[in-house]
Curated annotation (Swiss-Prot):
Protein name in the entry: Tryptophan synthase alpha chain
Top-level EC class as recorded in UniProt: lyase
This protein's pathway: Amino-acid biosynthesis; L-tryptophan biosynthesis; L-tryptophan from chorismate: step 5/5
Reactions this protein catalyses: (1S,2R)-1-C-(indol-3-yl)glycerol 3-phosphate + L-serine = D-glyceraldehyde 3-phosphate + L-tryptophan + H2O
UniProt superkingdom: Bacteria
Assembly and binders: Tetramer of two alpha and two beta chains.
Record GO terms (molecular function): tryptophan synthase activity
EC number: 4.2.1.20
Underlying gene: trpA
Family stated for the protein in its record: Belongs to the TrpA family.
Amino acid sequence: MSRIQKTFAALAAQQKKGLIPFITAGDPAPALTVDLMHALVAGGADVIELGVPFSDPMADGPVIQRASERALAQGVSLTQVLAWVTEFRKTNATTPVVLMGYANPIERMGEETFAKAASAAGVDGVLVVDYPPEECESFAALMRANQMDPIFLLAPTSTDDRIAAVAKVASGYLYYVSLTGVTGSATLDLESVAARLPLIKQHANLPVGVGFGIRDAQTARAIGSVADAVVIGSRLVQLLEDAPREKAVDSLRAFIADIRQALDA
């Protein structure tokens, strides 16, 4: 059982919903990344999604684009991100870490080299936004061969064929994007999410995390009523952009603790 699978099995046994926060590695300051990861866990995160900065993050809205730009301007690379995961693992051997990003940095490093390095660092899952599942069998197999779960996105526009293709290669959990568009945009339509998830479950026997459009404890709780887990990203990245640097860690922990409390209520 992978760390991600163990986490979701424990949540199911406790009848709890998963909380999966996203932050961009290196933002707002490289020196804070590992402390922010620990703050997420202290606040009640079950899985951490760590964004790998990239110069052309086409699926992301302006908030996460700016975070990527800030991190890249400070020299953050994929190698550096893996070093932070290694550092995090020195004092946390249980919380799964999923790298989320784009194909280009992985391909520059080389898929085999990346797979070995990420696994050695203690990465548990990899979500590559611009890898289509239909063309991803060898990459997914490489991840699994290195004890990592390949994680994929599904959207309201995903056809049955696309869902079936994802189900064939995915493990760990599925990330359902509850809105069409870029991260941080639009508002949430709970009814359409509730209607869609059973259709996904018909194809894939995996937990489903729902993200995009979750901004506060209230929306998180609403999504938690229908999904296995709640993914929250743009709102956290915005919080880190707005918070004074010296208060970033405490602000993040407090915000996540509020979400956790709402999910458990």
